[in-house]
Amino acid sequence: MYKDLEGKVVVITGSSTGLGKSMAIRFATEKAKVVVNYRSKEDEANSVLEEIKKVGGEAIAVKGDVTVESDVINLVQSAIKEFGKLDVMINNAGLENPVSSHEMSLSDWNKVIDTNLTGAFLGSREAIKYFVENDIKGTVINMSSVHEKIPWPLFVHYAASKGGMKLMTETLALEYAPKGIRVNNIGPGAINTPINAEKFADPEQRADVESMIPMGYIGEPEEIAAVAAWLASSEASYVTGITLFADGGMTQYPSFQAGRG
């Protein structure tokens, strides 16, 4: 537990399911005030609110598409209107879909880039604007991936979005460090989320993924939420401009284990 997170206001995009849901619940247990964002499934967002209430937390749900500028502006303003301020912005919303690069339509490309990269930029911009105008030493956390470092065939749009996020985060961190605003990435590896449920339910596919992880197991959403809580806390007060990989060692070239290579 991080006592300094108590009373902080945290906005998490794409937080009605998966990693975002786990982060919302974790910050609620830290006694932060949480803004749950969803794009279309209000019932999922309401379910998260119920879970937050069960742990004694305080939260609201705000509908919005991170690819729509006015929706992102409204999301941040809703947090400020409801809770009086904003302290932590977590740009978590994202998507992926496999397509051979030579068959990828411009629409396929734009959909992923607009959600993963442009959406994170808009969230970062609106949060930082508020921090600067109100002299707040706030925190921005962007949800990147091991694929900001590891190439991923059939997912060139996704890899490009996360590679772009890496330098976006580093640039924002450098630009706003003098004002005490911290900007960091989290780079998850293989995590047990709904988007991966079908794949990991297949024993052969699961074993194949686990073979790429030196620690030998697929991570849980709560392990990513723990990283987010630390990065948002004063324990990480001197940390900015990094990607903190939470991947069981996946980015450490496991094929070279045991002296191979």
Curated annotation (Swiss-Prot):
Alphabetically ordered keywords of this record: NADP, Oxidoreductase, Sporulation
Q: What residues does substrate bind to? A: 145
Keyword Hydrolase assigned to the entry: answer is no
Record has Oxidoreductase as a keyword: yes
Molecular function (GO) terms listed? glucose 1-dehydrogenase (NAD+) activity; glucose 1-dehydrogenase (NADP+) activity
Which residues participate directly in catalysis?
Answer: 158 (proton acceptor)
Q: How does it associate, per the subunit comment?
A: Homotetramer.
Q: Which family does it belong to?
A: Belongs to the short-chain dehydrogenases/reductases (SDR) family.
This one is known as Glucose 1-dehydrogenase
Q: Taxonomic lineage per UniProt?
A: Bacteria, Bacillati, Bacillota, Bacilli, Bacillales
